[in-house]
A protein has these predicted regions:
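Surface-exposed loop-to-helix/strand elements on domain peripheries
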Residues: 112-117, 121, 300-303, 318-435
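Long, highly charged low-complexity segments enriched in Glu/Asp and Lys/Arg with interspersed Ser/Thr
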Residues: 456-484
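Extended, regular secondary-structure scaffolds
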Residues: 149-254
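Long amphipathic alpha-helical coiled-coil segments
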Residues: 401-417, 448-465
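C-terminal structured domain segments
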Residues: 429-451
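Extended, helix-rich architectural segments
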Residues: 1-173, 180, 485
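Extended, charged amphipathic alpha-helical segments
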Residues: 234-370, 374
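Conserved small/polar residues in nucleotide/adenosyl-binding loops
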Residues: 496-504
Length: 504
């Protein structure tokens, strides 16, 4: 075989292989339906639902039924005490985390290429004044569901807007195993419509790619193409409309804001411990409520079934005795080990704090007014957890800037693609204010004024404070930094002018 023939065969083989790979990445209707079913049945989807439920304190203990086996089958004992004490420990941990990382306004940090902060101001203007609130929303979403999704679009006026899409509606189709770039996004959500005066629920499916979007309805196991939404004036719709033509962003307009690198919600790490805490406290409450905690010594009782006796006693608070002379009921009271029970609760509580990386509020160790070092130790686990989210959110903001830069270009506001802007998360930690102010005072001349202001306990918005200081210095400048005009009286003496005297 000649070399040329061999080379042609190799080229054909490579082309066939590339075609096979391309074909394997095509999202056909059957593949989309399969991906939807697989996602809805996955452990990740279940965790999203659990995270949302437990944040609303709808814990599993609320579904508890007390049963016993009767003649080989389970029977619910509705007459027994069944306290369902659901504790809000998970909600407290999530609120604590978001309040620590995302409630204080973020600071936009740029390199020296952005003169007069022109680019930063345009970024802030495009994202809008509510972007901080949107970051907080994404923080809750990522904490409860492992990931939050921000969708980028243009409104009817041509302004760039962003909206958070619930994570349980989004099925990402990643282009790589590290989940850094999307090939497509499948969004599934239900809407209610009226048909002949009856409500009907429709499952909508959107398939977003780098080239545009297609709309479907899911009916059973089949995708039905929605031509009205997918086509406009005879042509397919894309990401946004520029004048009269549809355009694309060049990327899938969905941005991930992850809770951590593995996209796991916080409930994953504490659910079993919280369930144990709920169960233990509920059992203790049942013990205090139920008559079963007394051991009954029956004399002359005519019934044969002890279950009927307990049931009758709980419902009627009385029993019938056949032998009126020698019959009766004596009771023995078992002792409850309160000390062991308390130790169990306290250990579970410590385990929840440790596994959930929450603030250690043990005042026995740190006292009622802990120092700065003690406070840092108390917040160390929470700070570690928040740093993981901070890294992922910084990456998400970097992806968002791609769309902001492109929007600034197409709207004729300039090309800022080569300028880097990052987010600085200003954490809100309880501090010893007196100690912090003293440290800031001692650091003057060693670090920049901006750093000192960022760490001063009285400052809530660093950028606003810097702007206020600049305006204050400009207003005070002529009074303290300008020498008053003088004139010679002819005898070699210098006199202040009248204008200068008036200023003194």
């Amino acid at each position: 075989m000649k070399i040329k023939e061999l080379w042609n065969k190799i080229r054909k083989g490579v082309k066939a292989g590339m075609a096979a790979v391309t074909e394997s990445n095509v999202l056909t209707d059957n593949r989309v339906v399969s991906m939807i079913e697989k996602f809805k049945a996955s452990g990740k989807y279940k965790l999203m639902q659990e995270g949302e439920r437990y944040y609303q304190v709808d814990n599993d203990i609320k579904n508890r039924k007390i049963t016993r086996k009767v003649d080989g089958h389970k029977e619910e004992e509705t007459w027994r005490a069944n306290n369902k004490l659901a504790h809000a420990k998970y909600k407290i941990q999530v609120d604590e985390k978001i309040a620590y990382l995302l409630t204080k306004p973020v600071t936009y940090k740029t390199d020296g290429a952005d003169k007069n902060d022109t680019y930063v101001e345009k970024v802030k203007d495009v994202l809008g004044k509510h972007f901080q609130y949107q970051l907080t929303q994404l923080g809750y979403e990522a904490s409860n569901k492992g990931i939050g999704w921000l969708h980028v679009y243009l409104d009817p006026k041509g302004k760039l807007k962003t909206i958070m899409i619930p994570a349980e509606q989004c099925i990402p189709y990643w282009s790589d195993r590290s989940h850094t770039e999307l090939d497509a996004m499948i969004r599934v959500y239900n809407t209610t419509v009226w048909q002949y005066n009856q409500e009907k629920e429709i499952t909508n499916v959107e398939i977003w790619t780098k080239d545009g979007v297609k709309y479907y309805r899911l009916e059973g196991q089949m995708l039905v193409y929605d031509n009205d939404k997918s086509m406009d004036a005879g042509g397919p719709v894309a990401h946004y409309k520029s004048v009269e033509e549809w355009e694309t962003w060049g990327k899938v307009p969905f941005i991930p804001f992850k809770n951590n690198q593995i996209e796991m919600p916080d409930i994953k790490f504490v659910k079993s411990l919280i369930d144990g805490y709920d169960l233990g406290r509920s059992e203790a409450a049942n013990y205090m409520d139920e008559v079963k905690n007394l051991i009954f010594v029956l004399k002359g009782y005519g019934g044969q079934n002890l279950s009927d006796f307990i049931k009758q006693l709980n419902e009627d608070r009385a029993i019938l005795i056949d032998d009126t002379e020698d019959g009766g009921v004596d009771t023995l009271t078992p002792q409850m080990d309160i000390t062991a029970l308390r130790e169990h609760y306290e250990q579970l509580n410590r385990d929840i704090v440790e596994s959930g990386q929450s603030v250690n509020k043990d005042l026995d160790k740190f006292g009622s007014a802990p120092s700065g070092v003690a406070l840092k130790f108390m917040y160390s686990s929470l700070d570690l957890k928040c740093k993981l989210m901070e890294t992922e959110f910084s990456r998400g903001f970097e992806m968002l800037l791609y769309f902001v830069d492109l929007y600034l270009q197409i709207s004729g506001q300039g090309d800022y693609e080569k300028i880097d802007v990052g987010l600085v998360f200003n954490k809100d930690m309880a501090i010893n204010e007196t100690e912090q102010i003293q440290n800031c005072s001692n650091s003057q001349g060693i670090v920049s004024d901006e750093t000192l202001i960022a760490h001063h306990p009285f400052v809530s918005d660093v950028e606003e404070e810097l702007k206020a200081l600049k305006e204050q210095k400009a207003a005070e400048g002529p009074a303290w930094d300008t020498a008053p005009p003088v004139k010679d009286d002819g005898n070699g003496c210098l006199l202040y002018t009248s204008d200068a005297a008036d200023d003194l």
